[in-house]
Amino acid sequence: MKKKALLPLFLGIMVFLAGCDYSKPEKRSGFFYNTFVDPMKNVLDWLGNNLLNDNYGLAIIILVLVIRIILLPFMLSNYKNSHMMRQKMKVAKPEVEKIQEKVKRARTQEEKMAANQELMQVYKKYDMNPIKSMLGCLPMLIQLPIIMGLYFVLKDQLVDGLFKYPHFLWFDLGRPDIWITIIAGVLYFIQAYVSSKTMPDEQRQMGYMMMVISPIMIIWISLSSASALGLYWSVSAAFLVVQTHFANIYYEKVAKKEVQPFIEAYEREHNGGSNKKGKNTQVVSKKKKK
């Protein structure tokens, strides 16, 4: 449910990003502008003008990387919680499915409440916290205002240096560029693909939709915006690809190690402490190998 809710949230954000406009001075006011947009403008201007000898392309890259590094602890916590929940659910799934069947067959409110209490006991047994799982998108919500602040600085070209010193690599930061737009779209496709690899099968369809929708939206906005925005998206997506890939490798190992005692307890419970492998044990063992 949580993952499905991210799709309309993402689409809503993209519509908001495409529609807001701070290019006119009279519109540069309000809580969001003063709290997130204006500080980003000042930092980018300081980096490009004072620290990097008017190299605003490099200033954008450094600022994006600094923001991503600051937000890294939130994202790593999200990766860890996601992998822990996924590995524990593999072990608990047979018991959870049985109780869910009881809930479906329940005819009275008392029977449903009893089944739900039983389900909570299973969650407690495997140290699973559904509320913690529901808060998994919190890191994304925390970072959005910060990332969006920089987005509006670049989209509406609020830094004068982008006009005075626009040249970076092969493109003009103040004008659209097809190649940096394509690079941004491809990188966001890869980022969505890397993220979808760790999704459960029932959620993977949503991941595939994001693989199509996010690059299209990125390309659509970038084609009519300054290439500084495409550079920002390219650097951000490249960082996320590397971050997601290595975080998934590391936290999958951590989660499997921490879940191992639950697997052993499950096997003892369903095999009576013997070496004989039953059907349920084989299911858990197969899931463990994946």
Curated annotation (Swiss-Prot):
Spell out the CDD domains in the cross-references.
5TM_YidC_Alb3
Fetch the PROSITE patterns from UniProt.
Answer: PROKAR_LIPOPROTEIN
The UniProt entry's sequence similarity note says:
Belongs to the OXA1/ALB3/YidC family. Type 2 subfamily.
Residue positions of N-palmitoyl cysteine lipidation? 20
Keywords noted in UniProt: Cell membrane, Chaperone, Lipoprotein, Membrane, Palmitate, Protein transport, Signal, Transmembrane, Transmembrane helix, Transport
Q: Which domain of life is it from?
A: Bacteria
Set out the biological process GO terms recorded for this chain's protein. Answer: protein insertion into membrane; protein transport
Region spans: Disordered = 270-290
User: This chain belongs to which protein, by name?
Assistant: Membrane protein insertase YidC
Q: Where in the cell is it found?
A: Cell membrane
